[in-house]
């Protein structure tokens, strides 16, 4: 989302600060989230160990800021190992995440804090690092933003899933169909 002039930039900045822009992300997380939907309401601060990392639970330093993420489960891929070396894992859960606050690494930090790190996330997964075949980056996609225009109308801008992420989901779907 880019502004073409200063007036538009100021308008967008004000909407973001007032939390009036709805952001939607798709994330594939490690393990099974049992609830169909939920809210993660955990403050986030800079990690005392790793300055690039933001943590919701544990040793934090600096300013601790409010952070809220709502989510909805879209699909479950239970017990599907991404490779023979990772057999016995709990599988993955595809979620739609809606950050209500705009903290750096908020979604990654929040899902890691509840024991369901984003797939392929080397910074936040720790010992739970799992990655479905075919992708080499975290499975987190900015899917849409929705906002009110100065005219009062609403607009929703959507971004297609990148080919590597779409292929990884397709592979998980095929494996799921075989299991059923």
Language model: regions and residue ranges:
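RNA pseudouridine synthases
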Residues: 2-180
């Amino acid at each position: 989302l880019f502004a073409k002039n200063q007036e538009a930039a100021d308008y967008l900045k004000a909407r973001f600060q007032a939390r009036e822009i709805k952001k939607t992300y798709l994330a594939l997380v490690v393990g099974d989230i049992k609830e169909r939907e939920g809210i993660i309401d955990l403050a986030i601060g800079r990690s005392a160990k790793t300055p690039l990392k933001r943590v919701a639970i544990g040793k934090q330093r600096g300013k601790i800021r409010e952070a809220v993420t709502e989510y909805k489960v879209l699909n479950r891929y239970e017990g599907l190992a991404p490779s023979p070396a990772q057999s016995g894992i709990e599988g993955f859960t595809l979620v739609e995440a809606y950050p209500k606050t705009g903290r750096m690494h908020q979604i990654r930090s929040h899902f890691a804090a509840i024991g369901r790190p984003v797939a392929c996330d080397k910074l936040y997964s720790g010992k739970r690092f799992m990655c479905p075949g075919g992708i080499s980056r975290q499975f987190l996609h900015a899917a849409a933003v929705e906002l009110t225009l100065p005219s009062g109308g609403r607009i929703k801008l959507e971004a297609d899933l990148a080919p590597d992420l779409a292929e990884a989901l397709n592979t998980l779907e095929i494996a799921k169909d075989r299991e059923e």
